[in-house]
């Protein structure tokens, strides 16, 4: 019986703090690297952001607030 296996992975993206834009060339290089490593097509299914606390409000909110 055949099986379908889905493998998920993630990698970092560079954000220019001045313009608040993603470095597209860095993203494209990472995608090409994964294509070579996995020897198959790669698709971006979802994006998410994991960042340091940027403001006092965010810090307080995540700690339970004050």
Swiss-Prot record:
GO terms for biological process: red, far-red light phototransduction. The keyword Transmembrane does not apply. The keyword Cytoplasm applies. GO terms for cellular component: COP9 signalosome; cytoplasm. It is found in: Cytoplasm; Nucleus. Keywords: Cytoplasm, Developmental protein, Nucleus, Phytochrome signaling pathway, Signalosome. Although strongly related to metalloprotease proteins, it lacks the JAMM motif that probably constitutes the catalytic center. Its function as protease is therefore unsure. Belongs to the peptidase M67A family. CSN6 subfamily. Component of the CSN complex, probably composed of CSN1, CSN2, CSN3, CSN4, CSN5 (CSN5A or CSN5B), CSN6 (CSN6A or CSN6B), CSN7 and CSN8. Component of the COP9 signalosome complex (CSN), a complex involved in various cellular and developmental processes such as photomorphogenesis and auxin and jasmonate responses. The CSN complex is an essential regulator of the ubiquitin (Ubl) conjugation pathway by mediating the deneddylation of the cullin subunits of SCF-type E3 ligase complexes, leading to decrease the Ubl ligase activity of SCF. It is involved in repression of photomorphogenesis in darkness by regulating the activity of COP1-containing Ubl ligase complexes. This is COP9 signalosome complex subunit 6a. The lineage of its organism: Eukaryota, Viridiplantae, Streptophyta, Embryophyta, Tracheophyta. The gene is CSN6A.
């Amino acid at each position: 019986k055949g099986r379908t296996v889905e493998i998920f992975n993630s990698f970092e993206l560079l954000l220019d703090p001045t313009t608040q834009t993603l470095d597209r060339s860095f993203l494209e290089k990472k995608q090409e690297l994964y294509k070579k490593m996995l020897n198959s097509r790669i698709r971006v299914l979802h994006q998410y952001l994991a960042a340091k606390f940027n403001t006092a409000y965010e810090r307080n909110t995540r700690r339970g607030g004050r």
